[in-house]
Amino acid sequence: MKILIDNNIIFSYSLFKKIGKVNLINSIDINAKNISGFDALIIKSSTNVNENLLKNSNIKFIGSATSGKDHVDVDWLKKNKINFDFAPGCNSVAVAEYVFSSMLYFAYRDKFSLLKKTVGIVGFGNIGKCLNKKLSAIGVKTILCDPILEEKNNIKLKSLNEIVQNSDIITLHVPLTYSGKYPTWHLINKKILLDLKDNCILINTSRGSVIDNNSLLNILKEGKPIRVVLDVWENEPLICSKLLSLIDIGTPHIAGHSLEGKIKGTISIFNSLCNFVGKKNKKYFISSFIDPYEIEYISMKGRIDQSKIYLLSLLSNNILYDDHELRKNFNKKNCFVNLRNSYRKRREWSSLFIKSNNILFSNLLNKIGFNSKFFKEK
């Protein structure tokens, strides 16, 4: 089997060579000509997979080492009997930590307690559930909106309008869809944006077009007092410089780019291709690919508070650094793509080992994703 793989998919060569002959390729060079002669194509979300790419190819398997699939024409693949798989949930922890870190930053900067705020989570899939678990662990009030889940499980959640009316912070975790009963394209439109509470924090880590970026730009120009975090943008990688200049935090679609999340995606697609070709494979663990965190342990004493959690989060991921890099390099050629492809080896909170002399503090840290143990002082 000949396998063509995006060269930014971490540890892909060492795994996929167990199945067949591997060629690595830059994502910008993935086209109809260059995939000729290959049996399997392994990609990221930057590659659009459709009839134009595949119609004259011999590809029998497409694997996307990503949690989403809106870059893939799944219906066309089914029609043409091309097997497809992706890695839902692989980056759920990373995105949830990015969003939580954003909230902690605003709480620190603007001097408020998250315990006095209501967080509206729009979309209650893998990421929404992970984030909700972390926020609930520290006592933050959350309200949920997911009409598809609501109908499927016959449960009562909130409508989008109720989320807008009652939330101090709104975070979006929906796929990008254009049709059906609940399309999400421009879900957050001009009317919704105007209806947001003053000083509301709006966070988008889902897909750029879930928010009408032009309407967002205009209401920010007009002085609407909201705070905005965008990791995803309309027309990526050609994002709007004016919009970037008006929001609080802007990053180049890297919310899910933790080292652990990337490895989960690679392992997931490797397992899928093994199943497709009927090859038995051993179970791989993330720890097989990652060295221990560079800090052996962190010792903390006393009671837990919001500021301590924020400081711990900075050791793993300072999103202000990513914001700074995007603004600093914005005018460079292929800035957005290059920042994504050369992204630092960001670790998840679980990589931090924390010794605490407070058992309640230690238990709480574990609930929100850190690796903590209680040590009784002698």
Curated annotation (Swiss-Prot):
Enzyme class: oxidoreductase
Involved pathway(s): Cofactor biosynthesis; pyridoxine 5'-phosphate biosynthesis; pyridoxine 5'-phosphate from D-erythrose 4-phosphate: step 2/5
GO BP of this protein: pyridoxine biosynthetic process
GO CC entries: cytoplasm
CDD domains to which the protein is assigned, alphabetical: ErythrP_dh
Active site, UniProt feature: 207, 236, 253 (proton donor)
Biological role stated in the UniProt entry: Catalyzes the oxidation of erythronate-4-phosphate to 3-hydroxy-2-oxo-4-phosphonooxybutanoate.
HAMAP family in UniProt: PdxB
Protein name (database record): Erythronate-4-phosphate dehydrogenase
GO MF annotation terms: 4-phosphoerythronate dehydrogenase activity; NAD binding; protein dimerization activity
Source species: Wigglesworthia glossinidia brevipalpis
The family this protein is said to belong to: Belongs to the D-isomer specific 2-hydroxyacid dehydrogenase family. PdxB subfamily.
UniProt keyword annotation of NAD present: yes
Enzyme Commission number(s) from the entry: 1.1.1.290
Catalyzed reaction equations: 4-phospho-D-erythronate + NAD(+) = (R)-3-hydroxy-2-oxo-4-phosphooxybutanoate + NADH + H(+)
Positions of NAD(+) binding: 146, 231, 256
Cellular compartments annotated: Cytoplasm
Subunit structure: Homodimer.
Binding-site list for substrate: 45, 66
InterPro entries, per database record: D-isomer_2-hydroxyacid_DH, D-isomer_2_OHA_DH_cat_dom, D-isomer_DH_CS, D-isomer_DH_CS1, D-isomer_DH_NAD-bd, Erythronate-4-P_DHase, Erythronate-4-P_DHase_dimer, NAD(P)-bd_dom_sf
Key words, A-Z: Cytoplasm, NAD, Oxidoreductase, Pyridoxine biosynthesis
